[in-house]
Amino acid sequence: MELVDAICSNPHARSVVEYCLTPCFRLSYSTLFKAVAEMTWDETALAHVVAPYLSQPQERPFKLLGVDVTPQPRQYAHTLADRGMIYQPNMVKGNKPITIGHQYSTVALLPEVEEGVSSSWIVPLLSRRAHTDEDKELVGAEQMDTLLKDNRLPFGHALCAEVGDTSYSKPAYLHANRHHGNLVTIARARGTRTFYRQYVATSEESEAGHPTWYGGAFSLKDETTRPEPDETIIVTERSRRGKVYRVEIKAWHNMLMRGKYKPKRLPMHRYPFSLVQAVRYDEQGALACQRPLWLIVVGERRHELNLSDIYHAYHQRFDLEHFFRFGKQKLLLAGFQTPEGVREENWWQLVHLAYAQLWMARHVAHNLPRPWERNLPSMKTCRTSPSLVQRNFGRIVRQIGTPAKPPKPRGNSPGRRKGTKLTPRPRQKVLVKNQQPAKPA
């Protein structure tokens, strides 16, 4: 408990061990690592903790969930098992954006915007490491299935929409949770893909032979293959800088994509979807973005979401990116250095719990700007952000107290005997997917 409070109230820690210097952490630094090592945490424990505090959506008829994967670079942890090649942005031009480490999949609730509260908040629900022999998107599908089939959580019967980036638009992920009738998946599609309209048979055709499922091709990069849209709306939005944009949203219903046959057959012709295109224009009528936004909307109840809901739901997906950035910079989400994979996973669970505690304290935090921040527009609007709550959390802990019992000294540990030599840990190989064995000369 005190470790979670220390994470929530110390935004200046540069390493995990510095959390023991936080006033609310009354134990020794060795206890910090012992707590992480001995921690036992069920996968759905965090979701059950925050479930009583989740409010019902008021402005939209569905609960919005987000799923994404973020890297944990560990290129120097040579004794850490199951390291693989992962994505990592690289600022040096010409270098490949990869490094060595782990990947973690997070599922979170994307709540509606509250008055006086920053729009970047999320509510983390599940976090799990994607092993090198697993598909990281299908790990997210398993997490989503865990949420929806848990009767103690409010997601099993309510209409839920999940949003994901382009990696979640592949057939394997879209097919994974179609047995949940209350789930609608919104995923971005690459602009080079080709989909198909449903085939409409004529009365003159024979019914003999294999049924025809796919009609004419619909190429996202070829406008000549697109028929007239089934639905079109125009919405207006204003940026933070005050610029006004006009967004034209079109939809083609009952589209199909081809499935896969390996490693197992995916009958995607059974799951028609709506294809949504969003094009953004500035005040002069010129294109504000070079390329249009293409979205796939699949699910039995997809027609209960209008085009405006779909467009704004996908844009809220970027709050997950804000969470990962804040977690790694202010909560040391990727800062725990250990050769034990289980302890690393425990630390990720602890940081997700700490962020959830910051979210629950958002309404009792005071706005405490620094002297040079008092005249900033963001401070004048008094929108409580995760950084402001973390800056104020020490006062909250001192005011309401902590349920943790005060520590009691138990004597001095004998420690290691003089002359003890520890066996060096074996070095682990870096696992590379699809690595072909070397051919004999």
Predicted regions located by residue number:
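Active-site-proximal, Lys/Arg-enriched surface segment
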Residues: 35-119, 124-127, 264
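Single, function-defining residue in the core of a domain
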Residues: 12, 78, 116-441
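Short, flexible loop/turn elements at secondary-structure junctions
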Residues: 23, 68-71, 111, 166-168, ...
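Gly/serine-rich nucleotide phosphate-binding loop at the start of the catalytic core
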Residues: 1-39, 45, 50
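Contiguous, well-ordered alpha-helical segments that form the cores/surfaces of helical PPI scaffolds
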Residues: 2-6, 106-108, 351-355
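A generic secondary-structure signal
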Residues: 22, 52-53, 146-151
